[in-house]
């Protein structure tokens, strides 16, 4: 296959150039029997050759580590469905279109964090202007005592479930105004919440770890007969993410109480949630307790494998792999990709290459995800020529590259400041029928932001809008931070206004970026207003330069500002934040008194 015009690399396929296949096959130090053992046995009713991980390889890997007996193999989130859509639980997939395409880990993790906890997406028939009117009232009046509810009453709204869901979506990072609106709607004559609106509120409470209120809402749903599997999944995942293992398992008891069946999909969801929270050992203990009560399937073992890899225990991962085989299950491409990615992330590149070779020679054949995993790692290590060899081999194998693969290459070349190559890649994506997606644009914006080119980041944002791709909150956070870093405070605030105009609810990071920018601009009084807004909304206290913040108010003769913030935080139930502000109030008073004595 001829090299693409954007490569700008001398890569002629000749005797002087080693092809990818030769590169893999000629790994002379590789003995596949050391890596795997092949046995002939009947799997699934037919004679096939199975692959087992030998103890020898893992023993060598473990003893080469300074972290004995653990290896560092954190696996990234997959963006694919684990269960049916009704459960909304993410998991693994062999489909290439569902590759976790966050070639930039920060972009990926923040996008993951921004993902909904599990509320079903249903097309809405609500008038956008009506949603905007309601949100404006809430945004302007929620901090006041009862004015918000009074104004909402005067609006004579035609309440619908779609309207409630859309408004809650707009305030998904601001639990207090969201919950006040939810409670107000519940009291309106002629309106009653359904399962969907309850689950929307459950998701917000779960995300902000308001577990006591979340369980109360769940039990209220139970008394009204509105519980769904999605409700339990939201609660289960929330407790697991907070490492509240016992409470996560306790959801099973609530399911029994309300006569819900606990099947393999439900158990898989809990095991997966525990594994993602790096509670692999706890997931294994739970599995061992329950395995006699249900029939584990391939996904069960895959989520356990992932869980052990995330806590860097390859010995247990290998045991799960071999247990899978002993149960008559043949590890599929998903399980292979989990192990492949784990080896790369633990910096065992040579072993990952060997496993990739085994997959090509003995199966299952690598899919687009497999190639993306390899290409992503080479790009992160700036081994762009090798990354392109894998890209060419993928195409030669009959696989079609998707936006995820291109995003990896774009990130790699962009990090090396080869922007001409980046733009050629973007052009090829369009020509090949794989236009940039949201993560591609976010990766580009981050590249521009890191290189202190906020104007270029804005141009990419405009292109994103032109192509009808909705920006995420992370998109705005990156551009806003980029402008503030460049000391272009006016544009930084303009990005904030654009985000609000787009109807995107600012999260903790958004407020932190804005407040830091305002403090840097010397506008601590305005920053204080947004800090108070965060506290009123029930958000976390931001990490900011409190020294600069205090100095500004000290110079302005306003040492009492931290006392006011401490009282506000205490009133909002943010006791840790109240203590922080109280300490700063004490220091500021002391400094002010010292200055007064000197004068």
Curated annotation (Swiss-Prot):
Residues 1-99 form a transit peptide. Its main location: mitochondrion. Keywords: Mitochondrion, Repeat, Transit peptide. It comes from the Eukaryota. It is found in: Mitochondrion. PPR repeats lie at residues 194-228, 230-262, 263-293, 297-331, 332-366, 367-401, 402-436, 437-471, 472-506, 507-541. InterPro entries: Pentatricopeptide_rpt, TPR-like_helical_dom_sf. GO terms for cellular component: mitochondrion. Pfam families: PPR, PPR_2, PPR_3. Belongs to the PPR family. P subfamily. This is Pentatricopeptide repeat-containing protein At3g62470, mitochondrial. It comes from Arabidopsis thaliana (Mouse-ear cress). The lineage of its organism: Eukaryota, Viridiplantae, Streptophyta, Embryophyta, Tracheophyta.
């Amino acid at each position: 296959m001829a090299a693409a015009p954007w490569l700008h690399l001398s890569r002629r396929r000749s005797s002087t150039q080693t092809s990818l296949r030769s590169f893999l096959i000629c790994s002379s130090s590789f003995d596949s029997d050391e890596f795997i053992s092949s046995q002939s046995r009947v799997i699934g009713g037919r004679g096939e050759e199975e692959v087992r991980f030998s103890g020898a390889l893992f023993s060598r890997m473990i003893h080469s580590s300074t972290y004995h007996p653990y290896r560092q193999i954190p696996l990234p989130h997959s963006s694919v469905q684990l269960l049916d859509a009704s459960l909304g639980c993410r998991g693994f997939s062999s489909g290439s279109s569902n590759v976790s395409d966050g070639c930039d880990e920060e972009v990926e993790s923040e996008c993951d964090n921004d993902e909904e906890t599990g509320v079903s997406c249903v097309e809405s028939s609500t008038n956008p202007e009506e949603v905007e009117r309601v949100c404006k009232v809430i945004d302007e009046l929620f901090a006041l005592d009862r004015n918000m509810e009074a104004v909402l009453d005067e609006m004579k709204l035609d309440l619908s479930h779609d309207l409630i869901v859309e408004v809650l979506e707009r305030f998904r990072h601001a639990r207090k105004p969201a919950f006040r609106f939810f409670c107000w709607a519940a009291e309106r004559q002629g309106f009653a919440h359904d399962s969907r609106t309850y689950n929307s509120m459950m998701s917000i409470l779960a995300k902000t770890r308001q577990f006591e209120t979340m369980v109360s809402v769940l039990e209220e749903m139970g008394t009204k007969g509105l519980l769904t599997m999605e409700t339990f999944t939201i609660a289960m995942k929330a407790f697991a993410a907070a490492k509240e293992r016992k409470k996560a398992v306790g959801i099973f008891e609530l399911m029994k109480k309300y006569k819900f069946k606990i099947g393999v999909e439900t158990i898989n969801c809990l095991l997966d949630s525990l594994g993602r929270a790096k509670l692999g050992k706890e997931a294994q203990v739970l599995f061992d307790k329950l395995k006699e009560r249900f029939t584990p399937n391939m996904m069960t073992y895959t989520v356990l494998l992932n869980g052990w890899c995330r806590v860097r225990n390859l010995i247990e991962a290998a045991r799960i792999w071999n247990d899978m085989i002993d149960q008559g299950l043949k590890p599929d491409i998903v399980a292979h990709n989990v192990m492949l990615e784990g080896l790369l992330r633990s910096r065992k590149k040579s072993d990952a290459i060997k496993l990739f070779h085994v997959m090509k020679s003995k199966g299952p054949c690598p899919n687009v995800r497999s190639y993306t995993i390899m290409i992503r790692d080479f790009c992160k290590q700036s081994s762009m020529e090798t990354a392109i060899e894998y890209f060419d081999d993928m195409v030669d194998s009959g696989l079609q590259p998707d936006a995820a693969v291109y995003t990896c290459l774009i990130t790699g070349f962009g990090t090396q400041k080869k922007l001409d190559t980046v733009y050629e890649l973007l052009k090829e994506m369009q020509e090949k029928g794989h236009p940039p997606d949201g993560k591609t644009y976010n990766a580009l914006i981050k590249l521009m932001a890191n290189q202190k080119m906020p104007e270029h980041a804005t141009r990419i944002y405009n292109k994103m809008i032109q192509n009808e791709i909705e920006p995420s909150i992370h998109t705005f956070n990156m551009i806003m931070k980029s402008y503030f870093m460049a000391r272009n405070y006016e544009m930084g605030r303009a990005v904030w206004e654009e985000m609000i105009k787009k109807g995107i609810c600012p999260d903790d990071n958004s407020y932190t970026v804005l407040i830091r920018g305002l403090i840097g601009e010397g506008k601590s009084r305005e920053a204080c207003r947004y800090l108070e807004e965060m506290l009123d909304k029930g958000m976390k206290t931001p990490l900011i330069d409190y020294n600069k913040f205090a100095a500004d108010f000290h110079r302005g003769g306003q040492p009492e500002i931290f006392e006011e913030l401490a009282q506000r935080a205490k009133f909002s139930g943010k006791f840790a934040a109240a203590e922080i502000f109280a300490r700063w109030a004490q220091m500021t008073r002391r400094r002010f008194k010292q200055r007064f004595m000197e004068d």
